[in-house]
Curated annotation (Swiss-Prot):
Originating gene: ADAMTSL3
Annotated InterPro entries: ADAMTS/ADAMTS-like (IPR013273), ADAMTS_ADAMTS-like (IPR050439), ADAMTS_CR_3 (IPR045371), Ig-like_dom (IPR007110), Ig-like_dom_sf (IPR036179), Ig-like_fold (IPR013783), Ig_I-set (IPR013098), Ig_sub (IPR003599)
GO biological process: extracellular matrix organization
Tissue: Expressed in epithelial cells of the colon, fallopian tube, skin, breast, prostate, epididymis, liver, pancreatic islets and bile ducts, as well as by vascular endothelial cells, smooth muscle cells, fibroblasts, cortical and ganglionic neurons and cardiac myocytes. Also expressed by malignant epithelial cells in colon cancer, as well as breast, prostate, renal and skin tumors. Expression is significantly reduced in colon cancer compared to normal colon.
Region (Disordered): 1146-1184
Name of the protein this chain belongs to: ADAMTS-like protein 3
Source organism (scientific name): Homo sapiens (Human)
Recorded GO CC terms: extracellular matrix; extracellular region; intracellular membrane-bounded organelle
Keyword Metal-binding listed: no
Length: 1691
């Protein structure tokens, strides 16, 4: 087959072949070869003349490129299909073709070309449209003599595959070519593409001829199961009070969204992206908009708004309505919402075996479609349409297993082996105690081994079976709730009263418990109304028989209002003075006038009102009082001519004496006034004519059954809330029982609450939990808490100190029996080979768990009956041949490598020259010459480059780079301190050089003039910790008595042998130990010592052992270990670490002793590219030593520490980039995002300003900068500066029996001669104060040294160490001083000797527990007498910190060692107990609390508070405050609790100074006091009674009356009055206040009389506005008629 020409040639050919332009213009165009796309049709293709679709075929499923014959060719005349051509496009979907030729000429049936799609991935956003590229190819070709900028013409239905373009800015459309290039889309809204000028169908799967279409969910050829249709409508409830309302939330990924609102409400969108950014989008005009990368079409009509979004949504859209008019709106919504969690099948898990036949499983995992991450399965169970696929199982590794060294591969699985299974743990406790909660359980996948062992395996092995249920509901019963008992009877028998009920907290079993919400408690009291009037409305006589004046009706009087003329205005009538019979009503009548100018009424004297005054009293009768019919018959009519004024009359009956079974009532006679019928005194009536006594029977009906109640029983509780019960029966009058329904009255309560007051705090003890073990010593725990039962039944948890009595034990031992013997195995060893098949071994021991929890090894015979465990198993490593080939391939592909050596090098003697290898960390002496080698692979050594602290190094007099790539430095000095980097292509390694000065401290590197680049993890202002350590080590090595190492004693010093130890495992041979001794000896002779990190770890461990044995003092050993670990455990940078680009080498890798390994840059390993230059933004770091500035404005760069002083007003922290670029800055404080405030000002460009900082502003401020290339972060500490404070303890300490004594400075210390004494000087201050020690009257001795924490160590003290030691702590803010006095005593224990006599023999008891007879020459053994000897050491008193100690108490024993009663040794002097510190190490962080403060108030309700901080107690005794995140949040104690005092003595309420004003700005304030004793006031001392009144200053009393101008006279002529406004105002603000504030001052008059012109004067107009009065028809009013007399008369 002929080879095809390059794409640009083909494109040029097509342009000239199909262009209608003249050939003369072709020479001006060099061709469109710049286009990345090209035509498919080959040169001279026979398809040029065939445009019919019948000549085309496509096989989109055939992706092969092999030259083979097609199986579909039946006639066999076709040759094999050729290779696929290059794709016509590089992105966006193109076409590729394949050709075949007919072997017999043109007699073959079928097509000779086929097509397929290719490059189906989307083009980048900035790529130009393919059709536009083809049009722009003609921009350099003249058309009709002119050049045009051609733009594509899309969606031509007549010729979709013709290249039609229109000239920009012209109304000119031209078909520039009959065919577009293959792969061009036919239309912009479909995937169909043009091939050879014909539009061919393309499905959503991007395949030719495919009919696949996207379903409603956007899934190609999907079934619509990944989304659900959401449709409906809702009514928008917006109003002037509720301006906005959420209508519907449409989540990210939704499609075919259509939201329509019908009505006046305005519809808008609130968006929220996955990154958390929010936005509001409102549109007023229709159009197509882009919202969060989502196309939104907005349509608007008069009463309709519609949003159409094809989707998918790129953010969450919340559609809201906003109020515009008072009319309801209806919102209709329709969209397809994606199912946010779907199942996805996983890949097959690894085969269960490597050979011999196994199986593989896969599973299904639930995936969050939005976040694209795996989530728990229950998220997918929420959707019913989500059906979890079943796991698939298939065989694997069917090849037979090879044999190796006689061991055959053990097949863990066979057809008879049970498959792995799920096993679950017990259910957890329910999440809630009632109301329905959940409980969970965990499960593991286990399998049974060939030996019957149940082993836990990976979860995927059990995926073939459904997982057990991990969650279930529990405690479904109702929670306790308030239940109200029946209401009591009303407290009154008539009218309005109260009734009560008992409200209890009842659980689902009907028991009275606590736990109900007090705020939801039902009310226990309410008002009640008895529908029986408190009088009996029974008429004494018919209405017709009453006198006329008794038949009065309520007159409807005309309501009077004040007018411009003074008028009598009545007040409302009062109630009738009686409820029955005649009474009186009264009212007030006042003279009032209406002031027109203020429209207010004012009161006038009565003489100002004309006319009669209205009545102020009138009689009333609500109804007649009760009387019997008989009384009316006894009425004696009065003669008409009688002059009698008073007479007797019956006024009803007394109440009936019984309510049933017959009672009686007496008639009541009263003396009445005949005319007024008012009751008067009986003495006014003639006693002779008093009516006779009369009685009548009443309530004669039989009595109904009634409720009978018994007495209340005892209360069920003494406090909190108890219950009392009583018997309630329904009984007939004869005490016979009756059914309860026959008792018509309300049943009395049979239950009531009692003792409703809070109980005192008490211990609440719960049940013991299950023992932690069944044997071998376990523990049982229970909760013991201090609780208080409240009146509502709930419990209040209190602190333990509030409960009286001892607290019960919360734990106890259990299962104190020995466990039976059992077999225990260790861990499997490493595989014996690195490739192929090997073996693993493990050890097995027989042991027993004793009752006290110790594991006791036993003889193997004790476990002989137990089934043995497998001790050997095979292991399969990768095939050796495969590893070798991979290594070769890997080594061949790798770039340069640097062969670094991770070692620590310490120089002890002066040497002229030292050789180092890259990767080391060296501590050298000044003036030493050093050569640093940089061995490399696959790199030319002469091209090696060197850097120091990030700057390139060049050859100089003192520094040079050899041809082999080594670095030479002559005569090391302070400027040479730093980090040196060897760069070999993409590989980098470093070496750290530091210098040890003559004072055995590290020499500080001089400050650089120019800002230098810092490397994370490097502390260039590092303290002289190693110098202190090295000083001690040189003292140890130069001490001739202990540690001196000369040529003869190097191999004989046990201390050095113990220090060096074995750096290999315990299986190392003696030869290796001797070799290391020789290496060590040689190193010391050479004046230096080099060790790898594993050796250094061994050194630390052995030094700890020497400390325990006493060969090295505790303080010295602790100091050395701490300093060496702190110095050498630092992370050593192996390459330039740009944040966000490369990973940091973990420090653990530097402490594993990986010597001689090939090291390479981690970034080079990851990418294999030269990327040590930063790509993303890099912050400028200019490290400065911490210092305090007393300026008002402090400017600092990020990464430095800033101190706040009392003078500080503004702090500016700059966060600049090394290379300015666009980036986003984010600031946080203590991990919390900073927001702008009054004190915090963020400018968004990398600067933060803190104004008027206080202690609240101190913290860690972190600046984070990011852009699309990467990010960087740095932080600064802002601290509040404090002067030093020494936490001294003024107490005397006498410990002559201790070998090691540690005290806090302050007081007097008495120690034994030869002891080691540590005087600690704990100090607080910011910045950390410097500590120095002095001795008064002399200098510090040679055995005195300063420890790293500021403590003073005195070793092997002697008499010359006695004296006063002064600790001085200083920082920039001040100085603090504390002293301790040291006295030395003789040692008491254990060198004490006890002498006792028995008979004529003297015995001496020494600390060695041997007794000698001083007077017996025969050597006769002493009598078997008891004696004192040291006992066992006690447990350490603390698990960490600096206060741990253990005690060795003496015990009385016999000669055979048997312990006896101490009473047998009373005649002997008892030795003092031994004492030594223990567990001196850092404690984990925990919560510390201060003591509770006093109540915040002296009376009433307040609170106690305390400080809660997270601290860590360190081994040196100091307490370090750490971040609260270091402590467990759930264990955080309360910082506040309520407290209640006696009621407060309060000044009466009101303003700040209430009461009556006593003068200018002075008031009288008073309060009430009461004696708090329960009995009476006599128990209080009157002399101490608080004052009841006081004068107080009140601005409210600084007032005065203010008068306004007089208004015109109210009378147009004659006599009238005029008024003015009188206000009470504040003298300072001149604002009106309440008039009661001015009552102490005389009020000016507000009105006065006035006289107008004479009323009989001429009729003239007295105002200029009379013309308007006439036109407005106001002449009918007297006021205007008088003032406009002339005008009104003319009308």
């Amino acid at each position: 087959m002929a080879s095809w020409t390059s794409p640009w040639w083909v494109l040029i050919g097509m342009v000239f072949m199909h262009s209608p332009l003249p050939q003369t213009t072709a020479e001006k165009s060099p061709g469109a070869y710049f286009l990345p796309e090209f035509a498919l049709s080959p040169q001279g293709s026979f398809l040029e003349d065939t445009t019919g679709e019948q000549f085309l075929t496509y096989r989109y499923d055939d992706q092969t490129s092999r030259n083979t014959r097609s199986d579909e060719d039946k006639d066999g005349n076709w040759d094999a299909w050729g290779d696929w051509s290059d794709c016509s496009r590089t992105c966006g979907g193109g076409a590729s073709y394949s050709l075949r030729r007919c072997l017999t000429g043109r007699n073959c049936e079928g097509q000779n070309i086929r097509y397929k799609t290719c490059s189906n991935h989307d083009c980048p956003p900035d790529a130009e449209d393919f059709r536009a590229q083809q049009c722009s190819a003609y921009n350099d070709v003249q058309y009709q003599g002119h050049y045009y900028e051609w733009l594509p013409r899309y969606n031509d239905p007549a010729a979709p595959c013709a290249l039609k373009c229109h000239a920009q800015g012209q109304n000119l459309v031209v078909e520039l070519a009959p065919k577009v290039l293959d792969g061009t889309r036919c239309n912009t809204d479909s995937l169909d593409m043009c091939i050879s000028g014909i539009c061919q169908a393309v499905g959503c799967d991007r395949q030719l001829g495919s009919n696949a279409k996207e379903d409603n969910c956007g899934v190609c050829a999907g079934d619509g199961s990944t989304c659900r249709l959401v449709r409906g409508q809702s009514k928008s409830h917006v109003s002037p009070e509720k301006r906005e309302e959420n209508v519907i939330a449409v989540p990210l990924g939704s499609r075919s969204v259509r939201i329509t609102v019908k009505g006046p409400a305005h519809l808008f969108i609130e968006s929220k992206t996955l990154q958390g950014s929010k936005g509001e989008h409102s549109f007023n005009s229709p159009g197509v908009f882009l919202v969060e990368n989502t196309t939104v079409e907005f349509q608007r009509g008069s009463e309709r708004q519609t949003f159409k979004i094809p989707g998918p949504l790129m953010a969450d859209f919340i559609f809201k309505t906003r109020y515009t008019a008072a009319k309801d709106s209806v919102v209709q919504f329709f969209f397809y919402q994606p199912i946010s969690h779907q199942w996805r099948q996983t890949d097959f898990f690894p085969c269960t075996v490597t050979c011999g036949g196994g199986y593989q499983l896969n599973s299904a995992e639930c995936v969050d479609i939005r976040l694209k991450r795996v989530v728990p399965d229950h998220y997918c169970h929420y959707y019913p349409e989500n059906v979890k696929p079943k796991p698939k199982l298939k065989e694997c590794s069917m090849d037979p297993c090879p044999s190796s060294d006689g061991f055959k591969e053990i097949m863990p699985y066979d057809h008879f082996q049970p498959l792995p299974r799920w096993e679950h743990n017990p259910w957890t406790a329910c999440s809630v105690s009632c109301g329905g909660g959940i409980q969970r359980r965990s499960f593991v996948c286990v399998e049974e081994s060939m030996h019957g062992e149940i082993l836990q395996v990976e979860e995927w092995k059990c995926m073939y079976a459904p997982k057990p249920k991990v969650m279930q509901t529990c405690n479904l019963f109702d929670c306790p709730k308030w239940i109200a008992m029946e209401w009591s009877q009303c407290t009154v028998t008539c009218g309005r009263g109260l009734r009560y009920r008992v409200v209890l907290c009842i659980n689902h079993r009907g028991e009275h418990v606590g736990g109900c919400n007090p705020q939801l408690k039902l009310h226990i009291k309410e008002e009640c109304v008895i529908p029986i009037p408190c009088y009996k409305p029974k008429e004494k006589s018919p209405v017709e028989a009453k006198l006329p004046w008794l038949k009065q009706a309520q007159e409807l009087e005309e309501t009077r209002i004040a007018t411009e003329e003074p008028t009598f205005i009545p007040e409302p009538w009062s109630a009738c003075s009686t409820t029955c019979g005649p009474g009186v009503q009264v009212r007030e009548v006042k003279c009032r006038v209406l002031l027109t100018f203020t429209q207010t009424e004012t009161e006038l004297p009565e003489e100002e009102c004309e006319g009669p005054k209205l009545p102020t009293e009138r009689p009333c009768l609500l109804e007649a009082c009760d009387e019997s019919p008989a009384s009316r018959e006894l009425d004696i009519p009065l003669p008409e001519d009688s002059e009698t004024t008073y007479d007797w009359e019956y006024a009803g009956f007394t109440p009936c004496t019984a309510t049933c079974v017959g009672g009686h009532q007496e008639a009541i006679a009263v003396c009445l006034h005949i005319q007024t019928q008012q009751t008067v005194n009986d003495s006014l009536c003639d006693m002779v004519h008093r009516p006779p006594a009369m009685s009548q029977a009443c309530n004669t009906e039989p009595c109904p059954p009634r409720w009978h109640v018994g007495s209340w029983g005892p209360c069920s509780a003494t406090c909190g809330v108890g219950i009392q019960t009583r018997d309630v029966y329904c009984l007939h009058p004869g005490e016979t029982p009756a059914p309860p329904e026959e008792c018509r009255d309300e049943k009395p309560h049979a239950l009531q609450a009692c003792n409703q007051f809070d109980c005192p705090p008490g211990w609440h003890i719960e049940e013991w939990q299950q023992c932690s073990r069944t044997c071998g010593g376990g523990t049982q725990n229970r909760r013991v808490t201090c609780r208080q039962l409240l009146t509502d039944g709930s419990f209040l948890n209190l602190s333990d100190e509030l409960c009286q009595g001892p607290k019960a034990s919360s734990h106890k031992s259990c299962a104190r029996t020995d466990c039976p013997p059992h077999l225990a195995v260790g861990d499997w060893s490493k595989c014996s080979v690195s490739c192929g098949v090997g073996i693993q071994r493990r050890k097995q021991v027989c042991q027993r768990l004793a009752a006290k929890g110790r594991r006791i090894p036993l003889s193997e015979m004790m476990c002989r009956d137990l089934p043995g465990l497998p001790l050997v198993r095979s292991c399969q490593m990768p095939e050796c041949s495969k590893i070798k080939s991979e290594m070769k391939t890997k080594l061949g592909e790798q770039g340069p490598q640097i062969l670094s050596v991770q070692r620590v090098y310490i120089q002890t003697r002066e040497e002229k020259r030292i050789n180092l290898t890259i990767g080391s960390r060296a501590y050298l002496l000044p003036n030493t010459s050093v050569i640093i080698k940089c061995p490399v692979r696959r790199f030319q050594k002469s091209l090696i480059q060197w850097e120091k602290d990030g700057r390139c190094l060049q050859n100089s007099k003192r520094l040079g780079i050899t041809k082999s790539g080594s670095l030479k430095i002559h005569g090391l000095a302070a400027p040479d301190i730093g980090v040196y980097r060897c760069i070999a292509g993409s590989a980098q390694e470093t070496v750290v050089l530091k210098l040890i000065g003559t004072d055995n401290r590290l020499i500080a590197r001089p400050a650089l003039r120019e800002p230098m680049r810092e490397y994370p993890g490097m502390d260039h202002s590092e303290a002289n910790s190693l110098g202190v350590t090295w000083h001690k080590m040189r003292q140890m090595w130069n001490n001739k008595n202990d540690l001196y190492l000369d040529d003869d004693h190097i191999s004989n010093q046990p201390f050095l042998r113990a220090l060096l130890g074995h750096c290999s495992n315990s299986a190392g041979s003696t030869n290796s130990w001797e070799l290391k001794n020789k290496q060590f000896e040689a190193a010391v002779k050479q004046g230096a010592y080099s060790m790898d990190t594993a050796q250094f770890d061994e050194l630390i461990r052995n030094m700890s052992q020497l400390m325990e044995t006493g060969e090295v003092s505790d303080d010295l050993a602790s100091q050395l270990i701490y300093q060496l670990v702190a110095e050498l455990a630092k992370a050593q940078p192996t390459h330039m670490q740009w944040r966000g680009i490369q990973e940091e080498t973990p420090p653990a890798a530097q402490l594993r002793g990986e010597t001689g390994s090939v090291s390479q840059s981690s970034h080079a390993k990851n990418s294999g590219k030269l990327t040590f230059k930063p790509k993303g933004p890099v912050l400028m770091r200019q490290s400065q030593p911490p210092s305090i500035s007393f300026n008002k404005t402090i400017n600092s760069r990020i990464g430095n520490t800033v101190y706040i002083t009392k003078r500080t007003e503004v702090i500016n922290i700059l966060c600049d980039l090394i290379t300015p670029s666009e980036a986003t800055y984010t600031w946080t404080k203590d991990g919390t995002l900073l927001q702008p405030s009054v004190k915090i000002i963020l400018d968004g460009t990398g600067k933060i300003q803190i104004q008027n900082p206080t202690r609240k502003e101190q913290g860690i401020y972190e600046c984070s900068v990011a852009n699309h290339l990467g990010s960087d972060v740095e932080s600064s500490s802002v601290l509040y500066a404090e002067a030093p404070v020494i936490l001294s303890v003024e107490r005397n300490i006498t410990k002559p029996e201790h070998n090691h004594l540690s005290v806090v400075v302050g007081g007097i210390v008495e120690a034994a001669l030869g002891a080691n004494v540590t005087i600690r000087c704990p100090v607080k201050g910011v910045p950390q104060p410097n500590i120095t020690w002095l001795k008064r009257g002399g200098s510090l001795s040679g055995n005195v040294s300063l420890l790293f924490n500021g403590s003073l160590l005195l070793q092997n003290v002697s008499l010359e160490n006695e004296g006063t030691y002064v600790c001085i702590a200083t920082n920039a803010l001040g100085k603090a001083v504390a002293t301790s006095v040291l006295h030395l005593l003789e040692r008491r224990w254990p060198e004490s000797r006890i002498v006792f006599l028995q008979g004529h023999k003297k015995y001496i008891l020494q600390a060695t527990n041997t007794r000698t007879n001083s007077n017996d020459p025969t050597g006769e053994p002493p009598p078997q007498e008891p004696f004192w000897e040291p006992g066992n050491w006690s447990h350490c008193s603390a698990t960490c910190g600096h206060l741990g100690a253990r005690i060795q108490r003496p015990q009385c024993v016999m000669a055979n060692g048997q312990e006896v009663s101490e009473a047998l040794c009373d005649h002997l002097q008892k030795p003092l107990a031994g004492f030594e510190p223990c567990n001196i190490r850092d404690c984990p962080a925990r919560w510390f609390t201060s003591v509770w403060s006093q109540c915040s108030v002296s009376c009433g309700e307040g609170y106690h508070s305390r400080q809660v901080t997270c601290k860590r107690t360190k081994a040196n005794g100091t307490v370090q405050v750490v971040s609260p995140r270091a402590c467990a949040p759930k264990d955080r104690p309360l910082g506040r609790k309520p407290c209640f005092g006696h009621p407060c003595v309060q000044w009466e309420p009101g303003n700040r100074c209430p009461g009556r004003c006593m003068g200018r700005a002075v008031r009288m304030q008073q309060r009430h006091t009461a004696c708090q004793h329960n009995s009476s006031d006599s128990n209080c001392d009157d002399r101490k009674r608080p004052t009841l009144r006081r004068n107080c200053t009140s601005g409210a009393c600084d007032v005065c009356w203010h008068t306004g101008p007089w208004k015109p006279c109210t009378a147009a002529c004659g006599r009238g009055f005029q008024s003015r406004k009188v206000d009470c105002i504040h003298t300072r603000s001149c604002k009106p206040v309440a008039k009661r504030h001015c009552v102490q001052k005389k009020k000016p008059i507000s009105w006065r009389h006035c006289l107008g012109p004479s009323c009989d004067r001429d009729c003239t107009d007295t105002t200029h506005y009379c013309m308007f009065v006439k036109h407005l028809n106001l002449c009918s009013l007297d006021r205007y008629k008088q003032r406009c007399c002339q005008s009104c008369q003319e009308g």
